[in-house]
Swiss-Prot record:
A zinc finger (C4-type) spans 7-27. The SPT4-SPT5 complex mediates both activation and inhibition of transcription elongation, and plays a role in pre-mRNA processing. This complex seems to be important for the stability of the RNA polymerase II elongation machinery on the chromatin template but not for the inherent ability of this machinery to translocate down the gene. GO terms for biological process: 7-methylguanosine mRNA capping; heterochromatin formation; intracellular mRNA localization; negative regulation of autophagy; negative regulation of transcription elongation by RNA polymerase I; positive regulation of transcription elongation by RNA polymerase I; positive regulation of transcription elongation by RNA polymerase II; regulation of rRNA processing. This is Transcription elongation factor SPT4. Belongs to the SPT4 family.
Amino acid sequence: MSSERACMLCGIVQTTNEFGRVGCPNCQGIFEEAGVSTMECTSPSFEGLVGMCKPTKSWVAKWLSVDANIPGMYAVKVDGRLPPEVVELLPHYKPRDGSQVE
């Protein structure tokens, strides 16, 4: 059984222990402002992995909307829904589960 999870907001993939210890390196401030735990905003169900070494220079990072995030492994699709408290803080939020068609 995999202990990896993906953030439902930015898509970064880390172990459950990493999310539990330090939270999401890209989104933790938003989760704290919303008053929700990191585990509520991560999912063990995700598809595809993309390694980002230089997100600011990557067209794939721009396509995944992670070009402003830290280098790391990112999921292409993350199943699940963010808590409404988080979504309310993000006027331009696009779900990473593929439910919103552009």
